[in-house]
């Protein structure tokens, strides 16, 4: 029953292989377990694993992550009062969808530059990256089935009047992949709807992009 941070991504066929990072030492030194969920949408188990977590199969990504969290709790690695979810960008979409579905499963969520207004972005073909996302998420503007499916899980559209865990959301003013208005809108709507007294924090980096600050000094400052 240790404190545990469960990282997840699950999109674009990107595999989250186990690796060492010195940025996690502060967690390890405080006896916090770092776990990485190999969920569908990634390609840890081949092309089929990716295809089963994209387009009209996207919800498999969210259910896999929830299953990983429940497994870690059932096996006594951690508990509901000690597990925190973490994901960034498309992993932030994952966190947003999961926290709307299972808010009582986590002590908290960390959502970095999260893709949380995914339906609005998908509908706006003038944005530079939208059309390139069709193969991953679908085309909601021209396909009714895609529209209804994305709407059914898009984090912004599925915020409810209920208790949420502690949530930290980060965004960057110069992010050209997930525009800063997405996390801001999500935070504002969440603040208006949540019925708990848990923390809801938004941090905006004024001189950073999608990957955070640039240069050695900027990276160290963020850490």
Outline where the language-model segments fall:
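Short beta-strand segments enriched for Tyr within beta-sheet-rich domains
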Residues: 2, 32, 105-107
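Active-site-proximal cap/loop segments of hydrolase catalytic domains
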Residues: 39-223
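Amphipathic coiled-coil/heptad-repeat helices and related helical stalk/stem segments
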Residues: 5, 20, 152-155
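Short beta-strand element of the alpha/beta-hydrolase
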Residues: 2-11
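Acidic helix/loop microenvironments that form the catalytic cleft of cell-wall polysaccharide enzymes
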Residues: 10-12, 90-91
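Glycine/threonine-rich flexible loop motifs
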Residues: 13-19, 44
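Short amphipathic alpha-helix adjacent to the substrate-entry channel of hydrolases
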Residues: 18-38
